[in-house]
Amino acid sequence: MNPAYRKAMLESEIQKLLMEALQQLRDPRLKKDFVTFSRVELSKDKRYADVYVSFLGTPEERKETVEILNRAKGFFRTFISKNLRLYVAPEIRFYEDKGIEASVKVHQLLVQLGYDPLKDKEKKEEDKEEE
């Protein structure tokens, strides 16, 4: 099996397991409905999993959410080790995913410049339907 393919499969499976574990986590400060693990990146030796977290809320709430998740990383690692057959369960490290926020800013800048990619896409689709 291609090592890159296996790594991608493991990252995807870890992401699914983390979402399951999040639902079982008992922390009243955590607003589970607004937390999403946008991506997981395994290190080459598969000992570390960097998990990027998207969260709807203020910057302070996002920072607090990442801190709460990092304090509970032992719980997440144990959950993964019980549900995934690996020699060593990876150490989990949570980070705020700023990619979505950055893409929204880029979109806003494009709109300010007079270019709206969403409207252009809709217009192209309408033109295709007319043909």
UniProtKB/Swiss-Prot annotation:
Swiss-Prot/TrEMBL keywords: Cytoplasm, Ribosome biogenesis
UniProt key word GTP-binding: no
Protein's GO biological process: maturation of SSU-rRNA
Subcellular location: Cytoplasm
GO CC term (a single one): cytosol
UniProt xrefs under InterPro entries: KH_dom-like_a/b, RbfA, RbfA_dom_sf, Ribosome-bd_factorA_CS
Source organism, top-level taxon: Bacteria
Gene Ontology MF: a single term: ribosomal small subunit binding
Disulfide bridge partners, by residue number: none
Gene3D superfamilies with a match to the protein in the record: 3.30.300.20
Subunit field text: Monomer. Binds 30S ribosomal subunits, but not 50S ribosomal subunits or 70S ribosomes.
Family stated for the protein in its record: Belongs to the RbfA family.
Physiological role: One of several proteins that assist in the late maturation steps of the functional core of the 30S ribosomal subunit. Associates with free 30S ribosomal subunits (but not with 30S subunits that are part of 70S ribosomes or polysomes). Required for efficient processing of 16S rRNA. May interact with the 5'-terminal helix region of 16S rRNA.
Name under which the protein is recorded: Ribosome-binding factor A
Species, as recorded: Thermotoga petrophila (strain ATCC BAA-488 / DSM 13995 / JCM 10881 / RKU-1)
Encoding gene, per UniProt annotation: rbfA
